[in-house]
């Protein structure tokens, strides 16, 4: 287990007296890996520094936004200049349109863009807009896909092909959950069956462009294109959640690597998309984009209401514009190469330690799934069936060696343009011991 960190421990003790679980987002509590969460006090490039002064190579990258590395000079310069002009105006600002124009240039399917503050807000608005535009009530989501913490999309999967879901969180009413159909991911037959049973009342299908919250799961060949075809045939909308993958997996997000690619074997296009994380460069910003005729259903032009005091905040807009301006094709090529290097080294270390595993990949995002080499991970059941118990000792070995991983096996690993040779070598050096720790993990009773 990780060595003593007294300042972090004291901060966590205090935080637990003031905040539920001592955190403002559950994964930060280290609940699935155990031990004391790290309280970070600074970040620069590829490194984080915690309250005890320990330095870590960062493979979380703020869950994606730190694409260029932490505290990138150009982003800081833009933010400082924006702060000097004022923090919030309650009015429109030039950079709102500047950022929207960048999104539209990179993702032409986003013909209109609405800025919001969080990914949850973006998906919430997308669902409301889809219902308002179609006049229908039901939404299909996939088990294991995460779209923020809005009530209707926290529904858990039921049994059967198109079972109306039960609430997946206390506080979500059965009536709300009943408007969500939860289906197995990568199963077009289940989608077809759901539309056969409920098609006249299905407003939308929402899916992550490539799921990364049950570990990374690659969409099967033709899956996203199939969703586009089925929704179009039935007059429903396809909402593609790129909050995590957008501008992280590539210049035009995961859609740009697949359905929107010039050489796409089966081109497809969403009706609505949601963006977050990278789009704000580390500031709280997200966006909804899509077909002009649908987006124009939003107020003030249309009957679907959405508003936000801090939507399009000038400091956040400045951070987003600066980040995307420096997120060039060369940056993505560099991160892609680093991702391949790291995943290969990870797999090699686990092989050497005799740990069965598979590496799950979507663009430059990847994760490890223990005990899955024979079948891989294609859906939520596969993800849940892995040898989760091996991750905690692996995580803490890496942490002790100065490498900060996602504190859950069900999260993606992130790299940045700041992960230079020194940072990579530190990670490589830590992998063999961590792999041995995973190999020697105690198997829980009953497995």
From Swiss-Prot:
The keyword tRNA processing does not apply. It catalyses: (S)-4-amino-5-oxopentanoate = 5-aminolevulinate. It is found in: Cytoplasm. One of its GO terms (cellular component) is cytoplasm. InterPro entries: 4pyrrol_synth_GluAld_NH2Trfase, Aminotrans_3, PyrdxlP-dep_Trfase, PyrdxlP-dep_Trfase_major, PyrdxlP-dep_Trfase_small. GO terms for biological process: protoporphyrinogen IX biosynthetic process. Pathway: Porphyrin-containing compound metabolism; protoporphyrin-IX biosynthesis; 5-aminolevulinate from L-glutamyl-tRNA(Glu): step 2/2. The keyword Repressor does not apply. It comes from the Bacteria. SUPFAM superfamilies: PLP-dependent transferases (SSF53383). Its cofactor is pyridoxal 5'-phosphate. Its main location: cytoplasm. Gene3D superfamilies: Aspartate Aminotransferase, domain 1, Type I PLP-dependent aspartate aminotransferase-like (Major domain). Keywords: Cytoplasm, Isomerase, Porphyrin biosynthesis, Pyridoxal phosphate. Its EC number is 5.4.3.8. The modification N6-(pyridoxal phosphate)lysine is found at residue 277. GO terms for molecular function: glutamate-1-semialdehyde 2,1-aminomutase activity; pyridoxal phosphate binding; transaminase activity. Homodimer. Belongs to the class-III pyridoxal-phosphate-dependent aminotransferase family. HemL subfamily. This is Glutamate-1-semialdehyde 2,1-aminomutase.
């Amino acid at each position: 287990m990780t060595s003593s960190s007294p300042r972090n421990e004291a901060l966590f003790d205090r935080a637990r007296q003031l905040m539920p679980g001592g955190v403002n987002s559950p994964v930060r509590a280290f609940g699935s890996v155990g031990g004391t969460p790290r309280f970070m006090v600074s970040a620069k490039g590829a490194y984080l520094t915690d309250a005890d002064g320990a330095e870590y190579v960062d493979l979380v990258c703020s869950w994606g936004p730190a694409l260029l590395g932490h505290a990138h000079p150009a982003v800081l310069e833009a933010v400082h200049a924006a702060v000097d002009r004022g923090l919030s105006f309650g009015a429109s600002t030039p950079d709102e349109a500047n950022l929207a124009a960048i999104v539209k240039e990179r993702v032409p399917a986003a013909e209109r863009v609405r800025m919001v503050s969080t990914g949850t807000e973006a998906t919430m608005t997308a669902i409301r807009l889809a219902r308002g535009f179609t006049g229908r009530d039901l939404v299909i989501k996939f088990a294991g896909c995460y779209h923020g913490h809005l009530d209707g999309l926290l529904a858990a999967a039921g049994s059967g092909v198109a079972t109306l879901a039960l609430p997946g969180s206390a506080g979500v009413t059965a009536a709300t959950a009943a408007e969500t159909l939860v289906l197995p991911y990568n199963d077009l037959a289940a989608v077809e069956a759901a539309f056969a049973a409920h098609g006249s009342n299905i407003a939308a299908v929402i899916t992550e462009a490539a799921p990364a919250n049950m570990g990374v799961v690659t969409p099967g060949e033709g899956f996203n294109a199939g969703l586009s075809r089925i929704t179009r045939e039935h007059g429903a909308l396809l909402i593609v959640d790129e909050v995590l993958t957008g501008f992280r997996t590539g210049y035009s997000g995961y859609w740009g690597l697949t359905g929107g690619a010039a050489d796409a074997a089966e081109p497809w296009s969403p009706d609505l998309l949601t963006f977050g994380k990278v789009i704000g460069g580390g500031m709280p910003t997200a966006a909804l984009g899509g077909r002009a005729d649908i987006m124009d259903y939003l107020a003030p032009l249309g009957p679907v209401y959405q508003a936000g005091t801090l939507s399009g905040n000038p400091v956040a807009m400045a951070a987003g514009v600066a980040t995307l301006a420096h997120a060039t094709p060369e940056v993505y090529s560099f991160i892609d190469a680093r991702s391949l290097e790291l995943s290969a080294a990870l797999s090699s270390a686990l092989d050497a330690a005799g740990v069965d595993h598979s590496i799950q990949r979507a663009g430059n995002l990847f994760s490890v799934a223990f005990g899955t080499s024979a079948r891989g991970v294609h859906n939520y059941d596969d993800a849940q069936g892995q040898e989760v118990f091996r991750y905690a000792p692996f995580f803490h070995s890496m942490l002790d060696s100065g490498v900060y991983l996602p504190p859950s096996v069900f999260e993606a690993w992130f790299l940045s343009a700041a992960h230079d040779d020194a940072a990579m070598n530190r990670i490589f050096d830590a992998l063999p011991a961590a792999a041995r720790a995973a190999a020697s993990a105690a198997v829980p009773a009953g497995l």
